[in-house]
Amino acid sequence: MSISPAIDQLVENLKRLPGVGQKSAQRMAFHLLERDRGGASRLAESLQSAVEKVGHCECCRTLTEEPLCRICSNPMRRENGVLCIVETPADVLAIEQTSQFQGRYFVLMGHLSPLDGIGPADIGLDELERQLQSEPVEEIVLATNPTVEGDATAHYIADIAAQLNINTTRIAHGVPVGGELGYVDQTTLGHAFSGRKQFSR
């Protein structure tokens, strides 16, 4: 049953968001229209503004309003010599929030997936190779997701790095802080054991 074509269209577009199904989209739509029309207008304006102003960094390909993002335009970050490879701009934000990494990034905007027709050129690996050949990089940190596709992508990049004699490391995967072993899947637990390190007191 349809109440309004405009509401139907709003619900359909809200369903484009990750993890949002029909029911969630309907709840959001009705909340905005019933209780928060001012918020709905601000949401529409900010979304329109972001779509118009935000593009990709010319160097690392993350999202930014400038030709170079704030990380790539920072001389100290560029001279660090460490390049972290991630799948999405959200990964950059997640790593930056830890304050543990002081190098720069290269954002793939995805991962290798031959079954979906996504090859090396589709995620910018040709561009990455050109950068590695032209700019001094001492270490590559592979921070792709711990999935079959993420691991395949990491291996592909490691092969490129090996040909250029660049040291390659992979972020550790294991048991999350606060997690209970009984709820951890076998693959994650296996990674945790193979990546164990000396206990420091």
Swiss-Prot record:
Q: Which residues form the Toprim domain?
A: 81-176
Zinc fingers (C4-type): which spans? 57-72
Q: Which GO terms describe its biological process?
A: DNA recombination; DNA repair
What keywords does the record list, in alphabetical order?
A: DNA damage, DNA recombination, DNA repair, Metal-binding, Zinc, Zinc-finger
MF annotations from Gene Ontology: DNA binding; zinc ion binding
Organism domain of life: Bacteria
Pfam families per UniProt? RecR_C (PF21175), RecR_HhH (PF21176), RecR_ZnF (PF02132), Toprim_4 (PF13662)
Q: Which PANTHER family match?
A: RECOMBINATION PROTEIN RECR
Physiological role: May play a role in DNA repair. It seems to be involved in an RecBC-independent recombinational process of DNA repair. It may act with RecF and RecO.
The UniProt similarity line reads: Belongs to the RecR family.
Protein known as: Recombination protein RecR
Q: Species lineage, top-down?
A: Bacteria, Pseudomonadati, Pseudomonadota, Gammaproteobacteria, Alteromonadales
**Gene name per UniProt:** recR
